[in-house]
Amino acid sequence: MAAYFLLGLYGSTLVYRLIFHPLNRFPGPLAARISDLWLCTQLGGHDMHHLSERLSKRYGEFVRIGSSTLMLTHPKAVAAIYGPGSPCRKGTFYDLEQPNRGIATRDESLHAGRRRVWSRGFGDKALRTYEPRVAAYVHMLLGRLADARGKPVDMARLAEAFAFDTMGDLGLGADFGMLRQARTHEAVEQLVQGMTIMGRRLPMWLMRLLIDVAQALVPTAATTGFLGFCHHHLDRFMADPRRSERPSLMAPLLSHYEKQNIADRDLSILRNDCRFIIIAGSDTVAATLTFAFFYLAKHPGHVTRLREELFPLRAADGTFSHQRIFDAPHLNAVINETLRLHPPASTIPRVTPPQGLVVADTFIPGDMTVFSSQYALGRSEAIYSKASDFIPERWCSRPDLIKDGSAYAPFSIGHHSCLGRPLALMEMRLVLAETLSRFDIAFAPGFDANHFLQHVHDCMSWHIGKLGLTFTAIE
């Protein structure tokens, strides 16, 4: 009897998904119509970015990549799915850490409340107090480059060290010591390993199952590894009587927590937000700086142009203030172009409202998972001329190379956009300005640029291999 029941269950599911499903009119691989597991079978190389580009070129701007999942690469999809007036809501992806909650939650009221508290740490006044501390880590990075004396360095690891050290300080007043000790912290290595499974884009029910099994097998996981690392530093921050003397991203979150009635306090929210600060604040900066240095080494003419733009903006001591460079056209163009080609969060899923959603005169049924691939959009000839080429001028002197600027949203848009954008841009501008004013950069001997790009992995954040560069001090 059980066999007949299962045969009927799976048989009817198969017929429904192949013939009667509301998404059947959208093109896509046949196996993807049958099961969401199709997607993870295609991502053994953790290359969702490449797959999304291939699928959009083969099937068009609306591609069914799961039984109830649609990938969109139409430029109007960004505003429709993520914009301020979008009726779309967060999907099951945001249940991954249940029952723990934080700013990355499906609960819109909780998210709105947490976002208001978070925003206090990212205002203009706060950024001005952070700048000297960011500058200190920039100069520590410059010291590491100078110590190499023109010998090859792995810029991907140095950018990672800079980003995590800076976020440890600004987020929690903590010293992670990665730049000082010239090594990757073991907790960061564990984070990278833990994020690798995200690159397979497993269905959420399977991800939850694996997490529950892992927690059952390793019950100490919450006190060891990256989670334990974050909790340890949060506990130290909470116990520090002098924490109010140095502004930090965590301070307004903790202040809000302590003002609540004891019965209303939820330490898990604070812990989740702590982890989110460290991860989100570090990955974007580290990856974007790595790719920016890659393209500048590949296209040295832009280094010359940047120096011509930046040298007149230096202070008497040869350093830069963010106020002087924040609107430097070519510097911002280099950053924007890097983010176009390698967006930090390429696939952010949403669920259409029950009444459905219209994108560019195309109706998408209700309660379907949709996302817009920033990676595929960034390389679409329908949106950018010479889309595969690194041309920063499209963001300043050559706006004709952008056919539809509304598709560009590396930090997302709307009320779920990245609050840390101003801080991330400040870090990137200062690193690039200070480094390029002191060093000539080039690929290390034997470095293969194509191999480097082919072995970049998309694990919801970028996992980047060794970027061998030489930095030679300018005479």
Swiss-Prot record:
The catalytic activity of this protein is classed by the Enzyme Commission as: 1.-.-.-
Query: What does the record give under GO molecular function?
Result: heme binding; iron ion binding; monooxygenase activity; oxidoreductase activity, acting on paired donors, with incorporation or reduction of molecular oxygen
Q: Which metal ions or organic cofactors does this protein require, according to UniProt?
A: heme
Q: Which residues are glycosylated?
A: 336
- The enzyme class is oxidoreductase
- Sequence positions that bind heme: 418
PROSITE patterns in alphabetical order: CYTOCHROME_P450
Q: Where does it reside?
A: Membrane
Q: Does the keyword Metal-binding apply?
A: yes
Keywords of the record, alphabetical order, are: Glycoprotein, Heme, Iron, Membrane, Metal-binding, Monooxygenase, Oxidoreductase, Signal, Transmembrane, Transmembrane helix
Quote any Pfam family the record assigns: p450
Q: Which GO terms describe its cellular component?
A: membrane
Q: Which pathway, per its entry?
A: Mycotoxin biosynthesis
Query: Does the record bear Cytoplasm in its keywords?
Result: no
Membrane topology label: Single-pass membrane protein
- Tell me which positions the record assigns to the signal sequence: 1-17
Give TM regions.
276-296
Which reaction(s) are listed as its catalytic activity? betaenone A + NADPH + O2 + H(+) = stemphyloxin II + NADP(+) + H2O; betaenone C + NADPH + O2 + H(+) = stemphyloxin I + NADP(+) + H2O
Q: Which family does it belong to?
A: Belongs to the cytochrome P450 family.
The function of this protein is: Cytochrome P450 monooxygenase; part of the gene cluster that mediates the biosynthesis of the phytotoxin stemphyloxin II. The first step of the pathway is the synthesis of dehydroprobetaenone I by the polyketide synthase sthA and the enoyl reductase sthE via condensation of one acetyl-CoA starter unit with 7 malonyl-CoA units and 5 methylations. The C-terminal reductase (R) domain of sthA catalyzes the reductive release of the polyketide chain. Because sthA lacks a designated enoylreductase (ER) domain, the required activity is provided the enoyl reductase sthE.
Q: What is this protein called?
A: Cytochrome P450 monooxygenase sthD
* Gene name in the database record: sthD
